[in-house]
């Protein structure tokens, strides 16, 4: 089996995490997984949604979108269509669920964190790149809240979160699929994990033939291996 990119089966794409990428947001990152590039920002606003009023905890919510020419052909803006598509809604809910798992909301205080992930160039794995980059932006946003005198109850950060794709490509498990691999893969899996080794989400779909338990285990093992590298890259970015 030869991957289109020439990478080994267990090799991640080149990953770069650039912090403080925009000027105004409390946390901002440009994350690059190969040719996939996503701007992730975290904005802090006082107050919480109505359903959390008086409960003594904060909230985090996420939005996701793609520039019209992030892909090979121009896509119409969802705003001009008047509604978000099902894929967009699914991905932004995934991002929100994943990042909430990083936090103890009771220590966040009466604030809402708005995570915005905007894909400026797509070559596969946009949702996993979004989660990985937004996690770093979230850490920076928490530092800003603390500097402003918040987080009196202690550090709300419980653990780091990251995500990666794995799949069965030409009968073999491969790590971090790009678009060419993703479009031809027999199975595509998106895996979200904590830095302590737990799974937050595993999204898997077979195209054509179903995948077998042994293949699932092989893909999850590959995801765990890749995730260890990604967590190291997150920590290195935060150390700069």
Swiss-Prot record:
The keyword Lyase does not apply. Its EC number is 2.7.7.56. SUPFAM superfamilies: Ribonuclease PH domain 2-like, Ribosomal protein S5 domain 2-like. InterPro entries: ExoRNase_PH_dom1, ExoRNase_PH_dom2, ExoRNase_PH_dom2_sf, PNPase/RNase_PH_dom_sf, Ribosomal_Su5_D2-typ_SF, RNase_PH, RNase_PH_bac-type, RNase_PH_CS. Gene3D superfamilies: GHMP Kinase, N-terminal domain. It is an enzyme of class 2 (transferase). It catalyses: tRNA(n+1) + phosphate = tRNA(n) + a ribonucleoside 5'-diphosphate. The keyword Lipid biosynthesis does not apply. It comes from the Bacteria. Keywords: Nucleotidyltransferase, RNA-binding, rRNA processing, Transferase, tRNA processing, tRNA-binding. GO terms for biological process: rRNA catabolic process; rRNA processing; tRNA processing. Phosphate binds at residues 87, 125-127. GO terms for molecular function: 3'-5'-RNA exonuclease activity; tRNA binding; tRNA nucleotidyltransferase activity. It holds the Pfam family RNase_PH_C. Belongs to the RNase PH family. NCBIfam families: RNasePH. Homohexameric ring arranged as a trimer of dimers. Phosphorolytic 3'-5' exoribonuclease that plays an important role in tRNA 3'-end maturation. Removes nucleotide residues following the 3'-CCA terminus of tRNAs; can also add nucleotides to the ends of RNA molecules by using nucleoside diphosphates as substrates, but this may not be physiologically important. Probably plays a role in initiation of 16S rRNA degradation (leading to ribosome degradation) during starvation. HAMAP family: RNase_PH (MF_00564). This is Ribonuclease PH. It comes from Pseudomonas fluorescens (strain ATCC BAA-477 / NRRL B-23932 / Pf-5).
């Amino acid at each position: 089996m030869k991957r289109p990119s020439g990478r080994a089966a267990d090799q991640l794409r080149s990953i770069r995490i650039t912090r403080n990428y925009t000027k105004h947001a409390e946390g901002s990152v440009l994350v690059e997984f190969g040719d996939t590039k996503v701007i992730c920002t975290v904005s802090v606003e006082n107050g919480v949604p109505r359903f959390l009023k008086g409960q003594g905890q904060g909230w985090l919510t996420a939005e996701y979108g793609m520039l019209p020419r992030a892909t090979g052909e121009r896509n119409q803006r969802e705003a001009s269509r008047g509604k978000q598509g099902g894929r967009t809604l699914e991905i932004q809910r995934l991002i929100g669920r994943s990042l909430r798992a990083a936090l103890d909301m009771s220590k966040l205080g009466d604030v809402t964190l708005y995570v915005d992930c905007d894909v400026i160039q797509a070559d596969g794995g946009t949702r996993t790149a979004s989660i990985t980059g937004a996690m770093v932006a979230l850490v920076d946003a928490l530092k800003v809240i603390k500097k402003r005198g918040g987080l009196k109850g202690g550090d709300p950060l419980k653990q780091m979160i990251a995500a990666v794709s794995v799949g069965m490509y030409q009968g073999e498990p491969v790590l971090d699929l790009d678009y060419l691999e993703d479009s031809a893969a027999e199975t595509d899996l998106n895996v979200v994990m904590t830095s302590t080794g737990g799974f937050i989400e595993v999204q898997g779909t077979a195209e054509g033939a179903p995948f077998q338990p042994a293949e699932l285990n092989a893909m999850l093992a590959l995801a765990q291996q890749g995730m260890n590298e990604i967590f190291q890259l997150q920590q290195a970015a935060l150390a700069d």
